[in-house]
Amino acid sequence: VRLWPRSLTFRVIAFSTMWAILAQVVVFTLITTLYRQASERGFDSLLSAHLFNLIGSVGVSEDGRLTGAPDLGDLRFSEPRSGWYWSVEPASAGVTGGLRSSSMTGAIPSPSITAVPFNTEFQRSYVADGLAGEHLAVFESEFVLDTGNQIARFRVMGNESELEEEIAAFQRSLLIYLSLFGFGMIAINAIAILYGLQPLRR
């Protein structure tokens, strides 16, 4: 008879502990998933905004040469090999020259149109390898610059590896906080259960 309260106490504590661990796992998964989705949406929105700003900052001269001095308002586009780049290249006959950010110290190839086709708005996105080994998210668009049907290809590239590092750092911090909270909750539950079942031992 004396063993019964102890067995009951163990089972109740074990059940509450398993439930607390399961709840923490669900909360961790839910929060990290929502954070990743929000971060990726914000990242894509930023690249899209930079792309439209770039398109609005470039023109073509009378002899068909690309002109402009785009300023996207982000210092990372001026830091060499930062993982944040932009470029403007001719995409039709009669257009010459090219523009690129000072951060882009080398060429970054783009996939063929067959491999990654443009959508109905003449835009496409893909992942590429950066100049420093980072992964890049690339937003690309072809745009008609004037009435002469002169077309240029605009690309804005963001450091996707940097985004993944930020998400991983958030996940580590969240895991630490939830672990501390979980251990505290389990300890409090155990103490409460032991105290609550004490009358059964008499």
Predicted regions and their residues:
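Compositionally biased, intrinsically disordered low-complexity regions enriched in proline and serine
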Residues: 36, 44, 78, 85-87, ...
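Juxtamembrane segments flanking the first transmembrane helix
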Residues: 2-92, 165
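Extracytoplasmic ligand-binding sensor domains of the Cache superfamily
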Residues: 56-57, 65-133
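General N-terminal targeting signals
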Residues: 52, 64, 71, 83, ...
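Extracytoplasmic
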Residues: 103-176
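Alpha-helical transmembrane segments of membrane proteins, especially the N-terminal anchoring helices
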Residues: 1-41, 146-202
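Conserved long hydrophobic alpha-helices within structured protein cores
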Residues: 48-55, 132-139, 197
